[in-house]
Amino acid sequence: MKPNYTKSTDGLIPVIIQDNITNIVLMLGYMNEEAFNKTQLEKRVTFFSRSKNRLWTKGEDSGNFLTVNSILIDCDNDTILIKATPAGPTCHTGADTCFNEKNTSIHFLNELEIDRKSVV
């Protein structure tokens, strides 16, 4: 399947980046067809930056690249899920994720234990 960029007026579609191991959502960005093709070719996540109005490879300044493990396209062909391995913090603030979550298996297991205790 290929993404359908014609569904949006600006040719951009949302891209969810998820950690390949922990499954924690790292960030949300947007891609046009050129960014998608570059991401597939180079195996590093590249977005179309709406603020910079250009292609932007995550980590191009910081070195915190997102290496692509797999690319999934939703049933409507208008949203992309990329499972990636981060080379460091994902957010420009230095946080593990752009949602200020810890991206560790220990954190995930701790949250799971807390959730299970609240059900009992």
Give short role names for the model-derived ranges.
Residues M1-L12:
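Short, basic/aromatic recognition patches
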Residues E33-F47:
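A short, polar/charged loop-to-alpha-helix boundary motif
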Residues M1, D19-I21, M27, K38-L41:
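Hydrophobic, well-ordered secondary-structure scaffolds
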Residues V119:
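Conserved small/polar residues in nucleotide/adenosyl-binding loops
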Residues L109-I114:
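Conserved active-site carboxylates
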Residues D10-N32:
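Active-site and channel-lining beta-strand-loop segments
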Residues V45-F108:
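Short, structured beta-strand-loop surface elements
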Residues I21-T22, E33-F36, N77, A87-P89:
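Short, charged/polar surface micro-motifs in flexible loops or helix N-caps
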